[in-house]
Structures are given as structure tokens and as C-alpha cells.
């Protein structure tokens, strides 16, 4: 009835204790000091008291009896205190264990990537402005943009030369570019006649001054 | 019948911290205009301006880089083809001045050894907000043996002078034998493989 509340792995020890009880009060003296209960201390005091009584009423025995009682009281206090402390710590441990499990479950549910490395970043997939493209893709796009820009500048320059009469029209032959002219025509079906003419001129001009154009192209940014 | 629209082609590069005004400096030079809205340059851009020096038509192909750290791997690959580099800081921004040594190190690491360098202290119209004295700019330029100008893209101070001086310095180093403009090889290399013309 005075047994301290034991659980789980301690149940075995409790059983052993019971066995000890079955072995009689003397069994308590054979127990490990770490498994002693106050019950055991009472058993021990019962055994010792019985033996002291058997020694008779010699005053030396009486004197010794006081000391033994004192020592047994100290043992009782220690065992009691120890068991209480163990029980308290056990409760505390179980409580913390439950709390950790709860937090862990909560954490994994909320953000599965809590354990990111120091050089990682989290991307919000619902953010319409989230990063999507790689540096290489940006590099490629920029290169293409700059290439097209430089080609446009070349074409504008050529056009300017043409407009200002530096290059006489119909110079040489643009026949080999006929296909491109057709393509240009098809792709600009909606544009008016004047625009078509400019495209035709441009293309034949590009062809005419091919070497010039190419030279500059090579000189252009890459 | 190739016509010649220029005698020489010089490739220049603008570098410096984000927001010091590299794009504005270039815009002032190429278009003689100024815009107060700040739009961070994405990676790299360029403009072309033809000038005449010592009777030669010189086409300046000026590369404008993004100052932001995140574009550095892209921008540094453009250093190598540059014949002249303008390093720009902002006289109202001490950090941009402190970073000059970092930019100079970048030049040492990525540009041609004989590249012509120039230091520009921009926004010199904002004297009330100045934190970098002109003398400090001059001093660091002297230490590195490079030219220095204080400029203002907004007030159009020293912009053309800076570009023309840099072009002259490059012209001075250019071999007397004038290269055929059609074959000027200024392909930047710079980690980016040159693309071949498909237009002809």
C-alpha cells in the first residue's frame, strides 16, 4: 500500500520487490540499495528490532538500539526522498518527451523543410513573382537581346545610308534573296505596299553589303 | 561594294556599384537625355555612339553593366573584350567609393592587361549631399595611375569629356596602321562564345 507508483520498465523491479516480500522481511536486506522502498526499510527495522530484543536488556544493547533506530530513520528519509525525486524526474521526462513529439509533428506539418542548410532559401510557390529562371537562361536571353539589338542598329544604319542616297538603289542583284523576300511578304501580309518595298530593299541591301554587315557582326558584342 | 561607316571600333565598359548612375551617364552621352526614375539594369546592355577624333570616325560600343552583386557572373564575362573601362562611384554614397578597390580588383582579374581605365565620381551636381571629397577621388586615381573626372549625368557635366578622353587614350595606344574596319576583331570572347552572323 505504501508502494511508490511504478510504471513501465519499473514494473519488473516491483515484481522483484514482491518476490522479496514473499521471501520474508529478511529479503529486504538482500536488495540493491537503489531498489529499496520505505516498506523495505520497515522490514529491515523489524528484523533488526527482533534481533536486538533477543540480545536481552544489556544497557549497551539499549544504547546501540538508539543509534540503530536513528540510522534506520535516516535511511527511511533518504529512500523516501530518493524515490520521490526519481518519480518527479520521471514525470518531467515523460512530459518533455510528449512536448517534443508534439512540436516535431507540428513542425513537419507546417513547413516540411525546416532543416534547411545555411545556403538554402525557401521559395513560395504561390508567389507570382517567385524566381523561376536560371542565371544561364538570363545570360542566353540577354545575349540574344543584345545580338538582335546590334543587328537592328546595323539595319537602321544601312537604311539611313540608303535613304540618304549613299547607296544607289537596285545596285547589283538581289535575286538570290528572292525567297526571303517572299517570306517577308507572307509574314507581313497585312502591311501596305510601301512597307513591303522597304523590306525588299532592306534585304537586297543586306545582301549587297554582305561583307560589310558580316564584318560588323563579328565585331559586335558576344 | 562595302561602304565604311567608321574607321575604328572601340569597346568600352561601365562598372560600379548599383545606383551610382552608370546607365544615366551612358544615356546622357548617347542620347543627351536624363531620366530620374531608377530602373536597375538587368545583367548587361549596350549603346552605340560614333564620334570623330583626329579625323577618324570612331564607333564606341559602350557596355552598361548591372551593379548588383547577383549579376556579377554575367557582367564579369564582358570585361575581357573591353578596351576601356569606366569605373563609376557616387559622390553622395561613401560605400560606392569604398568599393572602388573591389572593382579595380575585378578589372585586374577579368579584363585585358592593357585595358584603359578611368574613374568617375558621378552626381557632382548634388554637392549638398556630397560625402566623398573631390580630393579623395583624385588621390585614389593617382595611386592607381588612372584618369579621374567628377561628372553629372543630370547636369551634363564632364560626360562627353570623359568618354572622349577615354577614347583618345585608347586611340593613342592603337597601332598607326589603321585596321580594315570590316575586319576589326573586337569579339569579346569573355566566356561567351561568339555567334556568327547569319544575316548574309
From Swiss-Prot, chain B:
A motif (Switch 1) lies at residues 32-46. It is an enzyme of class 3 (hydrolase). One of its GO terms (molecular function) is GDP binding. Expressed in the hippocampus. Expressed in neutrophils (at protein level). Expressed in the testis (at protein level). Keywords: Acetylation, Cell projection, Cytoplasm, Cytoplasmic vesicle, Cytoskeleton, Endoplasmic reticulum, Endosome, Golgi apparatus, GTP-binding, Hydrolase, Isopeptide bond, Lipoprotein, Lysosome, Membrane, Neurodegeneration, Nucleotide-binding, Phosphoprotein, Prenylation, Protein transport, Transport, Ubl conjugation. GTP binds at residues 18-24, 35-36, 40-41, 67, 122-123, 125-126, 152-154. There is a cross-link at residues 102, 136, 154 (Glycyl lysine isopeptide (Lys-Gly) (interchain with G-Cter in ubiquitin)). The modification Phosphothreonine is found at residue 73. Changing residue 73 to A: Loss of phosphorylation. No effect on GDI1 and GDI2 binding. Increases localization to the cytosol. Does not translocate to LRRK2-positive lysosomes and does not promote lysosomal content release. GO terms for cellular component: adherens junction; cilium; cytoplasmic vesicle membrane; cytoskeleton; cytosol; endoplasmic reticulum membrane; endoplasmic reticulum tubular network; endosome. PANTHER family: LD44762P (PTHR47980). The small GTPases Rab are key regulators of intracellular membrane trafficking, from the formation of transport vesicles to their fusion with membranes. Rabs cycle between an inactive GDP-bound form and an active GTP-bound form that is able to recruit to membranes different set of downstream effectors directly responsible for vesicle formation, movement, tethering and fusion. That Rab is mainly involved in the biosynthetic transport of proteins from the Golgi to the plasma membrane. Regulates, for instance, SLC2A4/GLUT4 glucose transporter-enriched vesicles delivery to the plasma membrane. (Microbial infection) Upon Legionella pneumophila infection promotes endoplasmic reticulum recruitment and bacterial replication. Plays a role in remodeling the Legionella-containing vacuole (LCV) into an endoplasmic reticulum-like vacuole. This is Ras-related protein Rab-10. It comes from Homo sapiens. The lineage of its organism: Eukaryota, Metazoa, Chordata, Craniata, Vertebrata. The gene is RAB10.
Amino acid at each position: 500500500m505504501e508502494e511508490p507508483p511504478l510504471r513501465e520498465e519499473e514494473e519488473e523491479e516491483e515484481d522483484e520487490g514482491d518476490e522479496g516480500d514473499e521471501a520474508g522481511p529478511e529479503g529486504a536486506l538482500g536488495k540493491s540499495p537503489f531498489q529499496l522502498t520505505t516498506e523495505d526499510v520497515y522490514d529491515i527495522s523489524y528484523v533488526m528490532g527482533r534481533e536486538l530484543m533477543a540480545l536481552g536488556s544489556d544497557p549497551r544493547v539499549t544504547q546501540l538500539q538508539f543509534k540503530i533506530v536513528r540510522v534506520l530513520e535516516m535511511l527511511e528519509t533518504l529512500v523516501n526522498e530518493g524515490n520521490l525525486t526519481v518519480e518527479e524526474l520521471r514525470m518531467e521526462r515523460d512530459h518533455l518527451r510528449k512536448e517534443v513529439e508534439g512540436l516535431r509533428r507540428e513542425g513537419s506539418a507546417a513547413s516540411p523543410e525546416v532543416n534547411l542548410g545555411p545556403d538554402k532559401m525557401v521559395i513560395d510557390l504561390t508567389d507570382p513573382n517567385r524566381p523561376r529562371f536560371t542565371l544561364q537562361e538570363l545570360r542566353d536571353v540577354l545575349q540574344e537581346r543584345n545580338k538582335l539589338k546590334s543587328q537592328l542598329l546595323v539595319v537602321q544604319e544601312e537604311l539611313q545610308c540608303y535613304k540618304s542616297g549613299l547607296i544607289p538603289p537596285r545596285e547589283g542583284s538581289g535575286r538570290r534573296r528572292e525567297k526571303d523576300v517572299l517570306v517577308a511578304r507572307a509574314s507581313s501580309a497585312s502591311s501596305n505596299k510601301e512597307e513591303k518595298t522597304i523590306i525588299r530593299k532592306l534585304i537586297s541591301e543586306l545582301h549587297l553589303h554582305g561583307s560589310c554587315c558580316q564584318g560588323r557582326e563579328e565585331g559586335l558584342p558576344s | 561594294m562595302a561602304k565604311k561607316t567608321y574607321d575604328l571600333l572601340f569597346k568600352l565598359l561601365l562598372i560600379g556599384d548599383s545606383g551610382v548612375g552608370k546607365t544615366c551617364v551612358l544615356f546622357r552621352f548617347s542620347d543627351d537625355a536624363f531620366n530620374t526614375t531608377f530602373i536597375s539594369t538587368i545583367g548587361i546592355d549596350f549603346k552605340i555612339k560614333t564620334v570623330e577624333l583626329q579625323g577618324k570616325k570612331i564607333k564606341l560600343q559602350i557596355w552598361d553593366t548591372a551593379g548588383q552583386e547577383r549579376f556579377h557572373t554575367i557582367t564579369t564575362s564582358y570585361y575581357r573584350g573591353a578596351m576601356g573601362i569606366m569605373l563609376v562611384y557616387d559622390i553622395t554614397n561613401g560605400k560606392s567609393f569604398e568599393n572602388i578597390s573591389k572593382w579595380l580588383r575585378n578589372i585586374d582579374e577579368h579584363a585585358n592587361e592593357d585595358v584603359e581605365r578611368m574613374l568617375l565620381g558621378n552626381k557632382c551636381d548634388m554637392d549638398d549631399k556630397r560625402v566623398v571629397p573631390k580630393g579623395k577621388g583624385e588621390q585614389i586615381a593617382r595611386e592607381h595611375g588612372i584618369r579621374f573626372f567628377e561628372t553629372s549625368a543630370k547636369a551634363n557635366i564632364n560626360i562627353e569629356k570623359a568618354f572622349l578622353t577615354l577614347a583618345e587614350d585608347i586611340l593613342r595606344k592603337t597601332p598607326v596602321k589603321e585596321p580594315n574596319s570590316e575586319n576589326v576583331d573586337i569579339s569579346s570572347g569573355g566566356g561567351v562564345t561568339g555567334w556568327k552572323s547569319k544575316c548574309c
